[in-house]
Amino acid sequence: MGSTPFCYSINPSPSKLDFTRTHVFSPVSKQFYLDLSSFSGKPGGVSGFRSRRALLGVKAATALVEKEEKREAVTEKKKKSRVLVAGGGIGGLVFALAAKKKGFDVLVFEKDLSAIRGEGKYRGPIQIQSNALAALEAIDIEVAEQVMEAGCITGDRINGLVDGISGTWYVKFDTFTPAASRGLPVTRVISRMTLQQILARAVGEDVIRNESNVVDFEDSGDKVTVVLENGQRYEGDLLVGADGIWSKVRNNLFGRSEATYSGYTCYTGIADFIPADIESVGYRVFLGHKQYFVSSDVGGGKMQWYAFHEEPAGGADAPNGMKKRLFEIFDGWCDNVLDLLHATEEEAILRRDIYDRSPGFTWGKGRVTLLGDSIHAMQPNMGQGGCMAIEDSFQLALELDEAWKQSVETTTPVDVVSSLKRYEESRRLRVAIIHAMARMAAIMASTYKAYLGVGLGPLSFLTKFRVPHPGRVGGRFFVDIAMPSMLDWVLGGNSEKLQGRPPSCRLTDKADDRLREWFEDDDALERTIKGEWYLIPHGDDCCVSETLCLTKDEDQPCIVGSEPDQDFPGMRIVIPSSQVSKMHARVIYKDGAFFLMDLRSEHGTYVTDNEGRRYRATPNFPARFRSSDIIEFGSDKKAAFRVKVIRKTPKSTRKNESNNDKLLQTA
């Protein structure tokens, strides 16, 4: 694997990191040789004095290194104590890696290493944000590089909240600046299977016991013994429960307790689909009333999506009926949502109810503690569930290592119990705040109302007046103010605890130079769309049956009219309708955008935008139209077309081509 260039800064600027140069630290070897010939001089002279002083300095430094090596040797010898880990998910494997790197003897017990918590390969990718990637770097830089190379960067693009019906931006998230300003890796998504394979390979086959389900444990005060489902028993010095939201270790510690149902069921799937704005947008959260939809680029020409809907737990769909129900739930939503559903195969869709667990004030007892979902399972809305488990893993390994060092210095037994308490205390507040944020994000996403009248039953007619809902206006004001500080703390608030990790940004993480412009200018962001533009016949009464492809040649004019014109040098769209004039309208492409100009037609040209507002185009004045708009040539709706933008895919990707054909047929 080729090395990746790094940009290091000893004193990084809080506002900007230089991505233009590469600085590399050269580690100092413990075994070093110095040429002392330059210090030779006359005995008793200044040069001789300096020579003796330099030699003494070297001897002192050598003695210090030898003392440190002896201390490390003693420490490594004492660290042959055993750490038991229940659960081989992300949290369990990352902690096992961290503990192993610190010199501990680790054993991981997992009931089914191939299942990814029972949801198989279709559960898809997981988002690893900057804070977790930095913690992983502090644990093992080589493993972190493998993860980052295998992942798809989303933090270098626009991410945020949009209106589910219109698809217009509500709030944009800047996850790049907090990472770059603090010298952190940029957020990525990676396949769970790939991530688990990388971690398992780094931990080692000799450490992981597959098909080993921990059902009980015994804490004698000096040792901990785990009991497997098959009756086997293993003894160690401490036990870490990383066995997920339904943790058996947690139940045995504190008694059985019910997880908290979020009120939402979640459908999820992966589609072979490339959006037209893939270069500029990483992920979106589409907001709605009592439902919301999340889509994210996961690399390799694939998109992952989650569809949340408020309903009681325990529901089920008819056989092969999930896709049909999703179209019913999200009927009338924007093309960004519907296109993904169309492109997803029925068998690639999973459904699960969403639960979480409140962290609580006590994470463990005696020589047993908990980590990740087993103590603070979160709703997926912040994308921080796995990230918090990785942070937990680093901190727990650090506290155990500090306890060993203290025992070596004081020649006293290792205080395992106190080290576990310190781990819990150091993590409790941050985890509780982010856990609460995840719950709040779910509430905000599902109670969103674009217009006054939404969700008001008999008063729903008010929505036709398009009066912005007060909650929408106030919510946006609050989010605009609070979001930058919140993201800065979530992504960078733990970085100061990552001992031994210098602030650094990978040169390959550099964002597009236009990123700041995209944040501030929706129009500039929209012009980054790359795809073919189509006019698709709209409505049962449309007099045209074929789909029309628009040209993006700025030098070739395009005229819409009722009669062909052999002498016309440009593109001619002929619509045989009584309300379409001979020279009805002109379509213009300029600087990445399409415009429509009515040529003083008798019956006019009308545009209905993605928020449902219909207006008549002013004659001889170019009017911008966008994807999902409805264009009517004449007022009788017999020449109505829906604007559609579809990414142009390589001819070799037949599956994507068939998806594009499917989108054209179903639009």
Swiss-Prot record:
FHA domain span: 558-612
Binding site for FAD: 82-110, 360-373
Domain of life of the native organism: Eukaryota
Compartments where found: Plastid, Chloroplast
Transit peptide: 1-59
Listed GO MF terms: FAD binding; zeaxanthin epoxidase activity
Pathway(s) served: Plant hormone biosynthesis; abscisate biosynthesis
Any GO CC annotation of this UniProt entry: plastid
Pfam families per record: FAD_binding_3, FHA
Name of the protein described by the UniProt record: Zeaxanthin epoxidase, chloroplastic
GO biological process per UniProt: abscisic acid biosynthetic process; response to heat; response to red light; response to water deprivation; sugar mediated signaling pathway; xanthophyll biosynthetic process
Main location: plastid
EC number: 1.14.15.21
Reaction(s) catalysed by this chain's protein: all-trans-zeaxanthin + 4 reduced [2Fe-2S]-[ferredoxin] + 2 O2 + 4 H(+) = all-trans-violaxanthin + 4 oxidized [2Fe-2S]-[ferredoxin] + 2 H2O
Extra remark: Plants overexpressing ZEP show increased levels of violaxanthin and ABA and increased tolerance to salt and drought stresses.
InterPro entries: FAD-bd, FAD/NAD-bd_sf, FHA_dom, SMAD_FHA_dom_sf, Zeaxanthin_epoxidase
Induction: By ABA and drought, salt and osmotic stresses.
Disruption outcome: Increased endogenous level of zeaxanthin and reduced level of ABA. Reduced size of leaves, inflorescences and flowers, early flowering, increased number of wilted plants, premature seed germination and reduced osmotic water permeability and ability to close stomata. Reduced susceptibility to virulent isolates of P.parasitica and sensitivity to BABA-induced priming.
Top EC class, one word: oxidoreductase
Expression (tissue specificity): Expressed in leaves, stems and flowers, and at lower levels in roots and siliques.
Organism: Arabidopsis thaliana (Mouse-ear cress)
PANTHER family per the UniProt record, alphabetical: PTHR46496, ZEAXANTHIN EPOXIDASE, CHLOROPLASTIC
Cofactors named for this entry: FAD
Gene that produces this protein: ZEP
Result of altering G386E: In los6; reduces plant size, accelerates flowering and increases transpirational water loss
Role, per record: Zeaxanthin epoxidase that plays an important role in the xanthophyll cycle and abscisic acid (ABA) biosynthesis. Converts zeaxanthin into antheraxanthin and subsequently violaxanthin. Required for resistance to osmotic and drought stresses, ABA-dependent stomatal closure, seed development and dormancy, modulation of defense gene expression and disease resistance and non-photochemical quencing (NPQ). Through its role in ABA biosynthesis, regulates the expression of stress-responsive genes such as RD29A during osmotic stress and is required for normal plant growth during vegetative development.
Keywords assigned: Abscisic acid biosynthesis, Chloroplast, FAD, Flavoprotein, Oxidoreductase, Plastid, Stress response, Transit peptide
